[in-house]
Amino acid sequence: MSDVWQQQRQRMVDEQLRPRGIHDQRILAAMANVPRHLFVPEALQAQAYSDQALPLTLGQTISQPYIVALMAQELLLNPHEQLLEIGAGSGYAAAVFAELVRKVVTIERHQALAQQTQVRLRNLGYVNIEVVWGDGSLGYPTAAPYHAISIPAATPQLAQTLLSQLHDGGRLVAPIGDAQDQQLIRLQRQGQNWQKTTISNVRFVPLIGAGGWEHAPETTAEGE
């Protein structure tokens, strides 16, 4: 059966990612290697390599493969770097990032989900991922600074506390906008200045916490 899953991953890379502009060979290799079917509910495993977000528990989702690959590519990642992910979900994106950087810190606000994800990642052999339980909307200063920050959840603005946790030269990718429609952007720190790049129009689940929304607004989303 492992060969079947591997074939599905390779088909995902060849049919969903390459044609849509994912060209970084390290990212394509990571996407072909990480077993997405082990990060979704068992009842949805047959859909694991389809081009769609899938539901998890507690109202969370796992991002569609293209979005994970796109965010990884836009973060301009290097092997020696440390990355912060806000919103661990099932740990799929963290696993992809872990194949691209030295260390991943991923923070999840749902304690039960954080615990499940920690066990899953440990069982899959990911030793360079730290799963933290807490409000990630303000980042995680304990392990800062970071070379890259990934926020796979929509927020109306970015907290200065979060931005200050980036290294000089560091990059942050996040969907910014209202609860229904956002723009995926990259901010790159240049001293006290920021270079902004708009990537695409997107629709993600909301970022809940002190640095995002206090309560979840109604939305339909493609993000994790």
UniProtKB/Swiss-Prot annotation:
Pfam families: PCMT. GO terms for molecular function: protein-L-isoaspartate (D-aspartate) O-methyltransferase activity. Its main location: cytoplasm. Gene3D superfamilies: Vaccinia Virus protein VP39. Belongs to the methyltransferase superfamily. L-isoaspartyl/D-aspartyl protein methyltransferase family. It comes from the Bacteria. It catalyses: [protein]-L-isoaspartate + S-adenosyl-L-methionine = [protein]-L-isoaspartate alpha-methyl ester + S-adenosyl-L-homocysteine. The active site is at residue 63. Catalyzes the methyl esterification of L-isoaspartyl residues in peptides and proteins that result from spontaneous decomposition of normal L-aspartyl and L-asparaginyl residues. It plays a role in the repair and/or degradation of damaged proteins. The keyword Iron does not apply. HAMAP family: PIMT. It is found in: Cytoplasm. GO terms for biological process: methylation; protein modification process; protein repair. Keywords: Cytoplasm, Methyltransferase, S-adenosyl-L-methionine, Transferase. Coiled coil: none annotated. One of its GO terms (cellular component) is cytoplasm. It comes from Herpetosiphon aurantiacus (strain ATCC 23779 / DSM 785 / 114-95). This is Protein-L-isoaspartate O-methyltransferase.
